[in-house]
UniProtKB/Swiss-Prot annotation:
Coiled coil: none annotated. ATP binds at residues 206-208, 216-221, 290-291, 334-337. It is found in: Cytoplasm. This is Glycine--tRNA ligase. GO terms for biological process: glycyl-tRNA aminoacylation. It comes from Staphylococcus epidermidis (strain ATCC 35984 / DSM 28319 / BCRC 17069 / CCUG 31568 / BM 3577 / RP62A).
Length: 463
């Protein structure tokens, strides 16, 4: 089926996945709040990432670094000098656009070219395309553009009571630098030998020129990043390892391979620190978008921080007796983007045998579903007994309890929020201590002893 972004956004709002930020005050552009189901979904995604990339990995450990860092960090990392986007303004609408995205949107929507990449083009090359193609502002419909200029993406703030340059700080634009400055602390305290990785999940902030597409590109966002350190010369081998590992993590959690692709960056598209980068992209209803960047950052970050801080980041290899600064592979995943991908991939409208009405269903992997099961008393007269099943299961799983409206409407409601199993407690349950368990995807129903429910769910929702 062809999926519509507006329909998915409306479902997300209606069912409590995502709400507009500051909604009662008219909102704030491009801010979103995760509702009761959205926060459960996103937390389950983060848990699944941490489980596979940190807890179950023989290589990796985790940290949680501060958002506010010494400003020298950003000077050393290159963010103060290099963390810029190409900005262009339409003189009539007074709206500012990111030039490369303006071009890419035009090529996709007007030319049907989904693979055109403007990142890496010079300012002159981008301006020539805009002029030659007659690309217009989506609002004013005019091509009255300024020249393209650099725009630094970091949010500036101040610590203390005075707002002067000595108290200037920045909200971190990525979580990675908190890992790099802690490299020696982690390596020494955990007695790690190469290869090993350090991962973390946390908020980052970028003053994006043209955010949009719901939670895909926002100014406040969450990252799940791993910095994996290895011997120079082995970085491409490890990059390939993490490309496969990341792709399998997505497909194991029910992301369709048909909606995924791996795209290698061209040489002129690479970031200043990278000698090889591959993006795992997802086909959203609005087009292909980056989910996961898997970059070989070489020794750039550790070398920069070594030079600026005076700290020695050389690793003494016990096997070869060499000393060198490790290379780094970075699989960087946006938590909000991948949450959107799971929402889009799970969404379906399906016909129901014997009914003229279609059902809307979210086919989440059970490990990601906000609720693992819903307990549904057939009648409110049975609620006092059915609630005991809820209490029994909710100590181990996220369980919903729903006693309002007909059982059919409750099934549809649970389908629409992606609950894998509905447990119906009926009048026979009072006598035989069994319940009816309905499967979300197949809609098949089986009778099961109440005593077996916990074991059944544990097996079905594991990842």
């Amino acid at each position: 089926m062809v999926k519509n972004m507006d329909t998915i956004v409306q479902l997300a709002k209606h069912r409590g996945f995502v709400f507009p930020g500051s909604d009662i005050y008219g909102g704030l552009s491009n801010t979103w709040d995760y509702g009761p189901l959205g926060v459960e979904l996103k937390n389950n995604i983060k848990k699944a990432w941490w489980q596979k990339f940190i807890t179950q990995s023989p290589y990796n450990v985790g940290i949680d670094a501060a958002i506010l860092m010494n400003p020298k960090t950003w000077e050393a990392s290159g963010h103060l000098g290099n963390f810029n986007d190409p900005m262009i303004d339409n003189k009539d609408s007074k709206i500012r656009y990111r030039a490369d995205k303006l071009i890419e949107d035009y090529m996709q929507n007007e030319k049907g070219d989904e693979n055109f990449i403007a990142d890496g083009l010079s300012f002159d090359e981008m301006k020539k395309i805009i002029d030659d193609e007659g690309i217009v502002c989506p609002v004013s419909k005019t091509a009255n553009w300024t020249d393209i200029r650099q725009f630094n993406l970091m949010f500036k703030t101040f610590q203390g009571v005075t707002e002067d340059s000595t108290n200037e700080l920045f909200l971190r634009p990525e979580t990675a630098q908190g890992i790099f400055v802690n490299y020696k602390n982690v390596q020494r305290s955990m007695r790690k030998k190469l290869p090993f990785g350090i991962g973390q999940i946390g908020k980052s902030f970028r003053n994006e020129i043209t955010p949009g597409n719901f939670i895909f590109r926002t100014r406040e966002f969450e990252q799940m990043e791993l910095e994996f350190f290895c011997k120079p010369g082995e970085e491409i081998e490890w990059q390939n390892y993490w490309k496969t590992f990341a792709s399998e993590w997505l497909t194991d959690l029910n992301i369709s391979e048909d909606n995924m692709r791996l795209r290698d960056h061209d040489e002129d598209e690479l970031s200043h620190y990278s000698n090889a980068t591959t993006d795992i992209e997802y086909k959203f209803p609005f087009g292909w978008g980056e989910l996961w960047g898997i970059a070989s950052r070489t020794d750039y970050d550790l070398r920069q921080h070594s030079e600026h801080s005076g700290e020695d980041f050389k690793y003494h290899d016990p096997e070869t007796n060499e000393k060198y600064i490790p290379y780094c592979i970075e699989p960087s995943l946006g938590a909000d983007r991948v949450t959107l991908a799971f929402l889009c991939d799970a969404y379906a409208e399906e016909g129901v045998e014997g009914s003229k009405d279609a059902r809307t269903v979210m086919h989440f992997h059970p490990a990601l579903a906000p609720y693992k099961a819903a307990v549904l008393p057939l009648s409110k007269k049975l609620s006092s007994e059915a609630i005991k099943i809820f209490e029994q299961l909710s100590s181990s799983f996220a369980i919903d309890f729903d006693e309002s409206q007909s059982i059919g409407k409750r099934y549809r409601r649970q389908d629409e929020i992606g609950t894998p199993y509905c447990i119906t407690f009926d009048f026979d349950s009072l006598e035989d201590n069994q319940v009816t368990v309905r499967d979300r995807d197949s809609m098949e129903q089986v009778r099961m002893p109440i005593s077996e429910l916990e074991t059944f769910l544990a097996e079905k929702v594991k990842f």
